[in-house]
């Protein structure tokens, strides 16, 4: 009986350790977050590259490996009715941090011209299958690029506060499962925007640096 109890305890500990290990993996290739109440103020996205694919030995300014570990973070913004309203790509180097404004960069020039009050933003980290990634031009529509780990992102959004007004919250993007069907859909629809949108639906690329929460418009 004692041996049986010890085995059960050991098994339970192993399962807890395994689940904790899985929970700690946050830099998955595909991540999702929603942004709400956009007419009341800006929502912000901060993105970094954890270095999961390597990093320059002597830093980004010197050496033959100065482009090691770079990833493309491909951005897809969806309106509440499932329409892809904008897409774009950002080159993110290891240990760098870049930002996007949802109003400023993702919804200011949508494909349809309609500016939604809330969006779902999906991020997909990719890189070339061989060699270093030095450009992310049109990578959001490129099915040949390989999804990779190394992406971590946070976002702020506005929630109605008790007593009126809005409160700003910041949370990490949620790691998500990327099916082949979803990958083909978002990349194919982005390709249609790039090819036929006459510049509309192409969101502005990331800017260097992290941004804190901004005040809402009451």
Regions found by a protein language model. Give the residues of each.
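Gly/Pro-rich, tryptophan- and cysteine-flecked surface segments typical
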Residues: 19-218
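Sec-dependent, cleavable N-terminal signal peptides
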Residues: 1-23
